[in-house]
Regions:
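Elongated, amphipathic alpha-helical interaction scaffolds
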Residues: 1-302
Length: 302
C-alpha cells in the first residue's frame, strides 16, 4: 500500500475566495436556468438542485467551480478567463473528491454495486485569447506516453462565451448572456482606461441597460471589488507564470504564497480598495491585511 500525505496532496491555496461567476450561479434559480439552457430540459423547481461546491478544495487557485446534482447527473461547471490545458486533471481530482464524499457511507467492498451519478464537465471561457467556440479537452492529452486506447479518460467541454460566441446558449440563459456582456465591457474598457474606471463604467452601463441590474445594485461593492481583483489577477497570473516559477521552486510553496499575498494586497490598495474589501476578496482577516498594508511596499519586491 502506498502512503499518501493527504494534507500535502490536497494542499489548498486559500488566497482567493470566489469569483463573480460563483456569486451568480450559486443562486439555484440562475443555476437551473443555465442547466436547462445547456441540456434542453425544462425544469422549473430550483429546489431540485442539490449544490455540492467544495470550499476551494484541491484547487490551487480561484474557486471557479460550481458542482451540483440533478436528474442523476453530477455536473461540474467552471469559469476560466485564461487558457489552461490542465483542467481535465483538475476535474479528475475534483470528481474523485466529490465521489468520495458522496459514497462515504456506502460499502465499497461489498458484492452490491454502488451507483454513482454520471459526471459532466463544462468550462465557460471568456478570456481575451482567441479560442474556438467549442473545444473538447481530454485527460489523455496530458499523458507522457501516448499509445492505444487510454485506460482512464476524462473529457471536458470548453464553451467560449466571449463576444458573439455561443449566442444561442447565452440567449437561452439570460444570466449567462448578461454575465458575458458585463465581462466583455470590462475587458474592452481596460484597453483605454484604468481597471477601476473600466469596472465602474461597465457597472453603470449595465445597470442602465438592465444587464445584471438587480444583482449589481444589490451587491455593487462586493461585485466591484471582485471584478477588479479578477481582471488584475488575470494579468498577474501571467506575469507570475513567466517570471516566478523557478523562484517559487527555490523558496518553497509556503513562502511563495506569502509573497503573492503581499503583492496582491499592495496592488489592491493602489487600486483604491479598502482594507475590508481586500480582506473579503482575499479571504483574510482585516488585521492581517492591515499588517501587510503597513509594511514598506519596497520590501515586497525583494
Amino acid at each position: 500500500m502506498t502512503n499518501v500525505n493527504t494534507s500535502e496532496a490536497l494542499h489548498v491555496n486559500r488566497t482567493f475566495k470566489s469569483t463573480l461567476f460563483i456569486m451568480l450561479f450559486e443562486d439555484k434559480k440562475n443555476l437551473l436556468e443555465l442547466y436547462n439552457a445547456i441540456t434542453g430540459k425544462h425544469y422549473a423547481d430550483p429546489e431540485l438542485l442539490e449544490i455540492n461546491t467544495l470550499e476551494n478544495a484541491i484547487y490551487m487557485s480561484m474557486k471557479n467551480d460550481v458542482s451540483f446534482l440533478i436528474d442523476g447527473r453530477l455536473s461540474l461547471y467552471e469559469h476560466q478567463s485564461t487558457k489552461n490545458p490542465n483542467l481535465p486533471l483538475r476535474f479528475l481530482l475534483y470528481i474523485s473528491h466529490l465521489y468520495s464524499r458522496l459514497t462515504v457511507k456506502e460499502n465499497l467492498y461489498g458484492e452490491t454495486i454502488v451507483q454513482i451519478p454520471a459526471p459532466e464537465f463544462l468550462i465557460f471561457y471568456n478570456g481575451k485569447d482567441k479560442m474556438p467556440e467549442r473545444q473538447i479537452l481530454r485527460l489523455s492529452d496530458m499523458y507522457s506516453v501516448q499509445e492505444g486506447q487510454p485506460k482512464l479518460e476524462l473529457e471536458a467541454t470548453l464553451l467560449n462565451i466571449s463576444g458573439s460566441n455561443n449566442q444561442k446558449l447565452k440567449e437561452a440563459c439570460r444570466t449567462l448572456g448578461e454575465y458575458a456582456i458585463y465581462t466583455d465591457k470590462i475587458r474592452n474598457y481596460t484597453e483605454t482606461m484604468e481597471l477601476s474606471e473600466a469596472v465602474d463604467r461597465a457597472m453603470d452601463e449595465c445597470i442602465r441597460e438592465d444587464v445584471l441590474r438587480e444583482f449589481l445594485m444589490k451587491h455593487r461593492a462586493e461585485a466591484r471589488a471582485m471584478s477588479i481583483f479578477e481582471y488584475d489577477q488575470e494579468r498577474h497570473m501571467q506575469q507570475e507564470r513567466e517570471a516566478g516559477i523557478e523562484k517559487g521552486r527555490r523558496i518553497g510553496l509556503a513562502e511563495g504564497e506569502e509573497q503573492l499575498l503581499r503583492r496582491q494586497v499592495q496592488k489592491n490598495l493602489s487600486r483604491g480598495m479598502s482594507i475590508s474589501e481586500i480582506a473579503e476578496v482575499l479571504d483574510e482577516t482585516e488585521e492581517r491585511i492591515r499588517e501587510i498594508a503597513s509594511e514598506d511596499p519596497g520590501e515586497q519586491a525583494e
